[in-house]
Amino acid sequence: MKLLCWNIRGFGNLGRRRQLIDYIRQEDINIVGLQETVRQDFSIQELQGLSRHPFAWQWLPASGQSGGILLGVREDFFSVEDMDRGEFFLSMAITDRRVNLSWEVIIVYGPADHGRLAAFLTELQDKVERCTFPVVVAGDFNLIRTEADKSSPNIVRRRMRMFNDAIAAMALREIARVGARFTWTNKQ
């Protein structure tokens, strides 16, 4: 199973969309979670064109010129049991058709405005607590867990502590990411 999670910074950017299509097809991606789509809506043709396989899609519209989440799962691999959304997340409860294992994938896009940090973490904790299946939470949290996650020395330890406390309260474990260390590098 392969999950692609990417802050695409604008689904309308043709170069990024071409990269997305190529990656989904070359790597045979089963789950797609995009943040910062900067889109209100998607056409069926756009979504069908992303993969050679059928996907179930849902999206959270952008707020003006920022935000937006797109989540899709391959329908030949997964049956979708339920979908949910909040201000900062989209989720699908899915069952893997091959092994009959049910779990929930939650894609988040945390607020860049750290004044909304408490609302984001509270919403995420409430969502995880309501889950009846094991969960995978992925996305752009707009937060860091350690000083090594930051490229500059400007670190707000209070936010880092809040994030780590929330992760501990949800009993989540971090999965090492693959790819560029920072999403804004030239190897997007």
Q: Predicted regions span which residues?
A:
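A shared catalytic/ligand-binding motif for oxyanion handling
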Residues: 1-188
